């Protein structure tokens, strides 16, 4: 099974990651990871840090001559802001010594951020450690670690893609409004990669040009209003075999794991599998996906619709996995909100810390990564193996076995 840990602060020298459990003999190069690190900076409405960072992963172990070894893989991504920013981060984030005498402590928590909760939990008198570790900068390393899982899925014809369906008040209201376009892209391209490639061409990662233009205008107006925006995105996984996940234990249910994967990302406050929220107010006859006869040699029974999002009983059906994430507006606003200075106990307005107007497009690419990691773990649980050739033998045996 895969497991990864990340370490590092947003304005420290670097962020670090370690991934264990990756099978041996998996083709892997830094380019496989850097492609998706670059995509993480996509999207209209990003802040100043996107002009400072140029994320490139360094692999220090677990890979030799372009293939994984089966041992832990370690990564490093340097923080460009550490040296390029003129705020004196090498001194403010020093590992040793004492704080600079002129360093101002952060004592004003921002509503909606981890500042106050982290200060109280870890008893910091300065919220800078909370701000820097809870920052979405950490997701760069998540994307790096999870890109290995994505590369593993690709070896077996499983692809992951995403697109944005709403930013603030602008976007689609019902899944049927974008499903045909999404499905056509996937069918024409042969998998979910075609979905993300098309979305990446849009300033807002949407697959509808008219909606992209409206969202850009909405973001521009929100910037003038000194506010921020959240939104909704959809992640799709194609090529998934039936039987991943399980109904026999609560923690093996794949739909529950997918929701956790989305909501573990900073600022994501809700998730649904398939048409979950919409299904709640529809009659069952319009929700459940009719089963059709399968072709000779096929593993999965096709469904006329996919409102369930590719799972039933926490187990994959063979239909594409569909999961949506709901992101709250970024809590760092140009417009001050009411807060309290924890050093004095007096009411004070918040101060602005560099941020985006919206990062929903970026969040959708991070969600691709966490979903890929989750599906890869379910895949390994079913098929197992210490190397890619061993896993391939297990997959081929499963496909060849009669399954009534």
UniProtKB/Swiss-Prot annotation:
Its EC number is 4.2.3.5. FMN binds at residues 133-135, 266-267, 313, 328-332, 354. CDD domains: Chorismate_synthase. This is Chorismate synthase. Gene3D superfamilies: Chorismate synthase AroC. Reduced FMN (FMNH(2)). This reaction introduces a second double bond into the aromatic ring system. It comes from the Bacteria. It comes from Salinibacter ruber (strain DSM 13855 / M31). GO terms for molecular function: chorismate synthase activity; FMN binding. PANTHER family: CHORISMATE SYNTHASE. The keyword DNA-binding does not apply. NADP(+) binds at residues 40, 46. Keywords: Amino-acid biosynthesis, Aromatic amino acid biosynthesis, FAD, Flavoprotein, FMN, Lyase, NADP. Belongs to the chorismate synthase family. One of its GO terms (cellular component) is cytosol. The gene is aroC. Pathway: Metabolic intermediate biosynthesis; chorismate biosynthesis; chorismate from D-erythrose 4-phosphate and phosphoenolpyruvate: step 7/7. InterPro entries: Chorismate_synth, Chorismate_synth_AroC_sf, Chorismate_synthase_CS. It catalyses: 5-O-(1-carboxyvinyl)-3-phosphoshikimate = chorismate + phosphate.
């Amino acid at each position: 099974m895969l497991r990864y840990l990340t370490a590092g602060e947003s304005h420290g020298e670097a962020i670090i990651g370690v991934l264990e459990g990756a099978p041996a003999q998996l083709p892997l190069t830094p380019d496989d990871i850097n492609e998706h690190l670059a995509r993480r900076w996509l999207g209209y409405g990003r802040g100043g840090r996107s002009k400072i960072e140029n994320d490139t992963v360094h692999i220090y172990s677990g890979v030799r001559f372009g293939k994984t070894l089966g041992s832990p893989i370690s990564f490093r991504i340097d923080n460009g802001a550490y040296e390029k920013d003129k705020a004196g981060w090498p001194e403010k984030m020093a590992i040793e010594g004492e704080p600079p005498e002129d360093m101002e402590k952060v004592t004003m928590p921002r509503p909606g951020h981890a500042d106050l909760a982290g200060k109280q939990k870890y008893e910091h008198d300065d919220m800078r450690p909370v701000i820097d570790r809870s920052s979405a900068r950490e997701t760069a390393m998540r994307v790096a670690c999870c890109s290995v899982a994505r590369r593993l899925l690709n070896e077996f014809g499983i692809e992951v893609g995403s697109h944005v369906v709403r930013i603030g008040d602008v976007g689609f209201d019902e899944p049927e409004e974008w499903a045909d376009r999404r499905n056509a892209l996937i069918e024409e391209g042969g998998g979910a990669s075609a979905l993300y490639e098309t979305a990446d061409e849009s300033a807002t990662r949407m697959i509808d040009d008219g909606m992209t233009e409206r969202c850009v205008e909405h973001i521009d107006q929100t910037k003038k209003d000194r506010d921020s925006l959240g939104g909704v995105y959809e992640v799709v996984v194609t090529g998934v075999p039936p039987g991943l996940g399980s109904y026999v234990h609560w923690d093996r249910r794949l739909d529950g794991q997918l929701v956790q994967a989305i909501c573990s990302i900073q600022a994501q406050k809700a998730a649904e599998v398939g048409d979950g929220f919409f299904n709640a107010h529809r009659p069952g006859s319009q929700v459940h996906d009719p089963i059709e006869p399968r072709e000779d040699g096929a593993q999965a029974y096709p469904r006329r619709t996919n409102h369930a999002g590719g799972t039933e009983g926490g187990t994959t059906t063979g239909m594409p996995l569909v999961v949506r994430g709901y992101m709250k507006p970024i809590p760092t606003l140009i417009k001050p909100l009411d807060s309290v200075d924890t050093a004095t106990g007096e009411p004070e307005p918040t101060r602005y810390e560099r941020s985006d107007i919206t990062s929903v497009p970026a969040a959708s690419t991070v969600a691709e990564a966490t979903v890929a990691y989750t599906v890869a773990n379910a895949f390994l649980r079913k098929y197992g193996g210490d190397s890619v050739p061993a896993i391939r033998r297990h997959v081929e045996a499963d496909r060849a076995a009669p399954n009534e």
